[in-house]
């Protein structure tokens, strides 16, 4: 007999070789009906795997986070099985679970169509209805390689060859379909939900490397309940309507083109938004005691080697071949294989330390809060680029706080206050905090880590904020906080960060004179609120569906005339608004008023000032607000006051 320890701490005895299925069934039939896998000693395994030693056992139900992930993993395998049946010449590659769904990569000459997805979905429903057993088998490496070679599944062969010799080769069989997989899975295909949807097809490089062949990736989502699926599809539909790439084109904010992949061309209205945000942040950090600096965009390879970025980040850096540059100053190479002396900065921190080191610092100078709207460049594979959300050139609202260990808590509290105010002003009142503690491989002593972790946690607790812990997810040089905001359709975006760093001050020889007169290393707090301006603007566009609040709108008021008699009054009002630093545009064309209103509302202009003969004679303004059919009659001074009241 063996002891089985249950989640409530109680211990029951079972025969050696008992399965998780038998244990859960003996405890509760209602629990068993919802269980699709078990957790044995903190490891997820299939329900029918024998247990031969004393173990802790926990049921994984279909309505749990882990259960939903297994359900989605099952659905990915069923997708692959359906594709193999319908399109036998297709090679199946990999099919992991992702946030809210799954995908499976396929190698196939002919592209999948939307009609194909419909046929595949029906075949998947048929597979679920058959309720075939899903069985795990362990094969010898040679047998697995030979089997998949015979099946002409050459990607599976490559995957098996990459599995370490110490690991077993696990295979899952359902019906006549066999796939390489670690598992776990449900007991049969009938456990899998019928509430799934294949959402799209896209290209994906094998292994994410642009030098490799392009595969076809079918994305899908799966949920326990129909209501959950419907809710997700509604959010997906809303997200498509709000897509910042589409709105960016329609509103003439920015565009991308092949000659500068991943680098936005900002149009006047988009650049206006950019400048508004920059000016706002600049004012906020000035009030919070930051100094604002600017550091070179191109820095020597030697500095990047000292900082450690060259070793760890080189593949993501754009480099400049100075030998070639002497002949052609415009030629910049991004090949990492070329020995280069200069690199475009991917981050601002080494430059900030150069400014810190330029003069001798005393403990009285700390904390020193140094900010920069630094223009950075990072190489991202072309397949990973995604509008403003994933770019190669970007501006960060970056800052570094040079402080002592004893100042970490106070500086964290001050930063959190600043961050929450900024998010509130931009329309994101809810902020989630994640705390990432020490990883297994790390720099610094346990004593330093203890102090830094306790300082961050004490700051969060002092603020009365809830937080979740990401065990072992801190950087090797220090613990960190991540700040996540939620948009209008419930999506979460990680934007803000605060990262404690013990390592960079040592590498770049940053020091200050302590109260005892000795040299000491400062702690650096890397922190950002928005992250990159580009990504944050993309988030704002989608959050507001392009209808930015008055203070952020590139055009705040459109002044339009109805009749020729009102043209001079319209010009006068337009100029008055401009003189009061209000972003106004003027339309005195002969187009019909409904056409003008429709055009400006399509352009998401918050306010339209409509002027006819009546308004011209009275000196009043008929105001229409975006999304409203009603008109309000006010004076120009009232309009100006209204807009100023909304200014942040």
From Swiss-Prot:
Catalytic activity line of the entry: tRNA(Thr) + L-threonine + ATP = L-threonyl-tRNA(Thr) + AMP + diphosphate + H(+)
Names of the cofactor(s): Zn(2+)
Enzyme class, broadest EC rank: ligase
Manner of cofactor binding, per the entry note: Binds 1 zinc ion per subunit.
Tagged with keyword Transcription regulation: no
Domain TGS: 1-61
GO cellular component: cytoplasm
Coiled coil ranges: none
BP term (GO), one: threonyl-tRNA aminoacylation
Binding sites annotated in the UniProt record for Zn(2+): 349, 400, 526
Pfam families the record matches: HGTP_anticodon, tRNA-synt_2b, tRNA_SAD
CDD domains reported for this sequence: TGS_ThrRS, ThrRS_anticodon, ThrRS_core
Subcellular location: Cytoplasm
GO MF term set: ATP binding; metal ion binding; threonine-tRNA ligase activity; tRNA binding
Family under the similarity heading: Belongs to the class-II aminoacyl-tRNA synthetase family.
Assembly and binders: Homodimer.
General function of this protein: Catalyzes the attachment of threonine to tRNA(Thr) in a two-step reaction: L-threonine is first activated by ATP to form Thr-AMP and then transferred to the acceptor end of tRNA(Thr). Also edits incorrectly charged L-seryl-tRNA(Thr).
Protein name stated in the entry: Threonine--tRNA ligase
Organism annotation: Orientia tsutsugamushi (strain Boryong) (Rickettsia tsutsugamushi)
Gene that this polypeptide is encoded by: thrS
């Amino acid at each position: 007999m063996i002891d089985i320890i249950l989640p409530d701490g109680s211990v029951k005895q079972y025969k050696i070789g008992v399965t998780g299925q038998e244990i859960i069934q003996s405890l509760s039939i209602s629990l068993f009906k919802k269980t699709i896998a078990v957790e044995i000693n903190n490891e997820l395994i299939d329900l029918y795997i024998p247990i031969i030693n004393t173990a802790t056992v926990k049921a994984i139900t279909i309505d749990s986070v882990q259960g939903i992930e297994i359900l989605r993993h099952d659905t990915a395998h069923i997708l692959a099985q359906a594709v193999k049946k319908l399109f036998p010449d297709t090679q199946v590659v990999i099919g992991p679970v992702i946030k809210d769904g799954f995908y499976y990569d396929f190698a196939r000459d002919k592209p999948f169509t939307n009609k194909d997805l419909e046929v595949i979905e029906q075949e998947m429903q048929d597979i679920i209805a058959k309720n075939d057993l899903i069985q795990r088998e362990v094969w010898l490496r040679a047998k697995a390689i030979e089997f998949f070679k015979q099946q002409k599944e050459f990607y599976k062969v490559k995957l098996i060859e990459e599995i370490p010799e110490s690991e077993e080769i696990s295979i899952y069989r359902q019906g006549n379909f066999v796939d390489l997989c670690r598992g776990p899975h449900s007991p049969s295909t009938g456990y899998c939900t019928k509430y799934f949807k294949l959402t799209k097809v896209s290209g994906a490089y094998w292994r994410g490397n642009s030098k490799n062949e392009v595969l076809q990736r079918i994305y899908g989502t799966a949920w326990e309940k129909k209501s959950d699926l419907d809710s997700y599809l509604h959010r997906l539909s809303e997200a498509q309507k709000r897509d910042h790439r589409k709105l960016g084109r329609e509103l003439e904010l920015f565009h991308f083109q092949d000659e500068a992949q991943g680098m936005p061309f900002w149009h006047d209205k988009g650049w206006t938004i950019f400048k508004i945000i920059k000016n706002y942040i600049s004012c906020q950090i000035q009030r919070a005691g930051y100094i604002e600096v600017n550091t070179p965009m191109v820095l020597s390879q030697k500095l990047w080697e000292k900082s450690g970025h060259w070793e760890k980040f080189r593949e993501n850096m754009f480099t400049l071949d100075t030998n070639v540059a002497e002949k052609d100053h415009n030629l910049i190479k991004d090949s990492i294989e070329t020995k280069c002396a200069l690199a475009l900065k991917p981050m601002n921190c080494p430059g900030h330390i150069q400014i810190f080191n330029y003069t001798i610092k005393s403990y009285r100078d700390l904390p020193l809060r140094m900010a920069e709207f630094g223009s950075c460049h990072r190489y991202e594979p072309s397949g990973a680029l995604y509008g403003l959300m994933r770019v190669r050139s970007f501006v960060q609202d970056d800052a570094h706080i040079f402080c002592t260990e004893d100042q970490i808590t106070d500086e964290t509290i001050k930063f959190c206050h600043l961050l929450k105010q900024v998010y509130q002003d931009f329309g994101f009142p809810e902020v989630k905090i994640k705390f990432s503690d020490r990883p297994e491989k790390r720099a610094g002593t346990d004593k330093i880590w203890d102090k830094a972790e306790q300082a961050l946690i004490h700051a969060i607790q002092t603020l009365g904020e809830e937080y979740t812990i990401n065990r072992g997810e801190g950087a090797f040089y220090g613990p960190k906080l991540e700040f996540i905001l939620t948009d209008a359709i419930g999506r979460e975006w990680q934007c803000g960060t605060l990262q404690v760093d013990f390592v960079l001050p040592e590498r770049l020889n940053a020091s200050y004179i302590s109260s005892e007169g000795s040299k000491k290393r400062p702690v650096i707090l890397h922190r950002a609120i928005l992250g990159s301006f580009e990504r944050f603007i993309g988030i704002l566009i989608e959050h507001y569906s392009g209808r930015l609040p008055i203070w952020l709108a590139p055009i705040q008021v459109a002044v339009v005339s109805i009749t020729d008699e009102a043209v001079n009054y319209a010009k006068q009002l337009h100029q008055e608004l401009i003189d009061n630093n209000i972003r106004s545009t003027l339309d005195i064309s002969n187009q019909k008023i409904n056409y003008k209103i429709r055009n400006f509302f399509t352009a998401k202009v918050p306010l339209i000032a409509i002027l006819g003969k009546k308004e011209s004679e009275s000196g009043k303004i008929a105001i229409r607000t975006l999304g409203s059919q009603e008109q309000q009659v006010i004076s120009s001074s009232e309009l100006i006051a209204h807009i100023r009241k909304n200014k942040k």
